[in-house]
From Swiss-Prot:
Cellular compartment(s): Secreted
Tissue specificity of this protein: Corpora alata and to a lesser extent in abdominal perisympathetic organs.
CC per GO annotation: extracellular region
Main location: secreted
GO biological process: neuropeptide signaling pathway
Listed name of the protein: Pyrokinin-6
Endpoints of the signal sequence: none
Record key words, sorted: Amidation, Neuropeptide, Secreted
InterPro entries, per the entry: Pyrokinin_CS
Role according to the record: Shows a weakly myoactive action.
Organism: Periplaneta americana (American cockroach)
GO molecular function: neuropeptide hormone activity
Disulfide bonds, paired cysteine numbers: none
Family classification: Belongs to the pyrokinin family.
Length: 14
């Protein structure tokens, strides 16, 4: 998510 950490950002986001 946008408010999540970079690790999660590159996960669910992509």
């Amino acid at each position: 998510s946008e408010s999540e950490v970079p690790g999660m950002w590159f996960g669910p986001r992509l």
